[in-house]
Amino acid sequence: NAATILSFFISEKILTKKQTENFAQKIGSDVILGLNRLSKIYYSDGKIYEIKKSLKYYLVLVKPNFGCSTRKIFSFNKVFSKKQFSKSKKNISKNIIFNSKNDLENSAFKAHPKLKQLKNQLINWKKAEFVRMTGSGSTLVMYFNSNETAKNALKTFKRRLNNSWCILSKVI
């Protein structure tokens, strides 16, 4: 992935941090999120806040065999909520993350009803703490408190969703 390559260029002193950030912005707005291992909140105005306190979640990422056009999803979206996070909050708790939302989900679901069906199927698997869509889609992320539970979910959904890409990860 692009962020990994750019991180390598920083570590080998091929590019400066500023040059790397410029390239990341040109490649895609979310590339900058992967330049280091800190968890981040990406604001709608393009600003990024790094979370110092590590949150312990184990993740199962599920990507269906179709993608979502960012341009199309944003064109469907009419309402954007106000910021839920302020930069003055030093500690982002699990409760804040749990209660957050992605304004683009409803637009993605209108464009791709199968994506909504997939999210409902993931939510109905009660062992996940919650399920979120990444950016403008189409990847869905299941959040778990336990690595073992996440591994079991991965096995289950790899069998059930043979047309989807599924992988295990964790918040680092």
Where are these regions (language model features)?
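DPxDG-like acidic metal-binding loop motif
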Residues: 1-24, 33-35
